[in-house]
Amino acid sequence: MKTDLTHGPVMKTMLRFAVPMILGNLMQQCYNIADTLIVGQFLGAGALAAVGSAFSLMTFLTSILLGLAMGSGTVFSMRFGQKDELGLKEGILASFTLLGAVTVVLNVAVFLGIDWIIRVLQTPADLVGLMREYLIVIFAGLVGIFLYNFFASLLRSIGNSVVPLLFLAVSAVLNIVLDLWFVAGLNRGVAGAAEATVISQYVSGIGIAVYTWVKCPELIRKDRAVCLRWSRVREITSYSALTCLQQSIMNLGILAVQGLVNSFGTTVMAAFAAAVKIDAFAYLPVQDFGNAFSIFTAQNFGAGKTDRIRKGIRAASLTSMLFGLLISIAVFVLAEPLMTLFIDAGETAVIAEGVRYLRIEGAFYYLIAALFLLYGLYRALGKPGMSVVLTIVSLGIRVALAYALAPIPLFGVVGIWWSVPIGWLLADALGLIYYLAKRKTLLKDSRAGVK
């Protein structure tokens, strides 16, 4: 199924396309939510702290593949909007080759450097064994992550956001069932939680690859006119590398903060591990709406429909900011019951710290909603470098402030929490100023920009 996003009512078209993406990534978060819930309830705060720290690392590695897939998807969307079938097919081949090679390199690197990675994360000595046990298994899932993200990005770029949702739904349910079986039933500890996630990742990755091969042969089955051209590889790399850099910087910043959080001990680590899962789950809808808006904009950019892009910007801004505000209110009010989903009610210190985090950062989700729209807009308009700049500003300020404030007794760990919305605010301001100054040239006829 293909959907042309260059026609139809703007708001309705965007929402119809965005909703399956939002639901799909909510399902993807269920991988991590299930691990956290089950590990926290059955294995205790120490195991939860180890899995939470490992999650930050896996998020960083996944962001590399996700960034490459998202950058490739932008090019696919432009070609689809231009009705350039040959360019689309050659771009798909180039992208698959690039992402496959990066996946192999990542797999080798992380297995060789696992002990060094654990040291860099400042993991407490009593958690090193648990974290190593979890990481050895979870790293094996990178190929499954590659397959899912590549084919999901391809299908979304041609307007099909439903099929990726279906495969993630099956995978998420399987993950929860296997988590309970391996951890609670077979007593396999943190390794069991990792095994459940890896199996589920391969189910979604292989499943969506087979679906695309069978149902969309015109996209991926090679014909004589299609070959691996280095011009296509360079084009894909130019978009993908910058988007990958953006995603990696985002998660590298989080990883840097994780090391600082770890220095405050197991209680803060466990609180952060649970709160970050709630955090990611809460703002995920606006993140995915920003990605859907980016694909909508890229297709229309390829088709040269700048008036439709302007209408899309207005509609997306209103929708995303309103939703972000509603989520902020909900998380602020429900912070304590949300924490008790992950942490036993007896762990009062962990719950209190997690609530404090959520009521500081969660009050400002509308700021990150605006930032995700800016990321998507600049990526779709052929300016992925600006998305990188905004990410550097947001994360750079977050990390710098966190490390500056945390050692001061007056702030302590609260300084880490406050650094996040401050980074969002300053990046939003820069992105908006740049758009207002450059909007006439940014929205010029796209046919001149994607030849």
Which ranges hold each PLM region?
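Short alpha-helical transmembrane segments in multi-pass integral membrane proteins
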Residues: M1-A18, F76-V143, G185-A241, T297-F364, ...
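Short runs within selected transmembrane alpha-helices of multi-pass transporters and secretion channels
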Residues: A69, V137-R156, P164-A172, A193-I208, ...
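Transmembrane helical elements of multi-pass membrane transporters/channels
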Residues: R16-D35, V137, Y148, S171, ...
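Helix-terminus/linker motif at the lipid-water interface of multi-pass membrane proteins
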Residues: L26, C30-A49, I118-A125, W181-R188, ...
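Small-residue hotspots at the loop-to-helix junctions and early N-terminal turns
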Residues: A45-S56, L135, A194, T266-F281, ...
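Residue-level signal for short hydrophobic patches within transmembrane helices
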Residues: H7, M11-C30, A34, L57-I64, ...
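Hydrophobic transmembrane alpha-helices of multi-pass small-molecule transporters
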Residues: F60-S63, N175-D179, G205-A209, F281-L284, ...
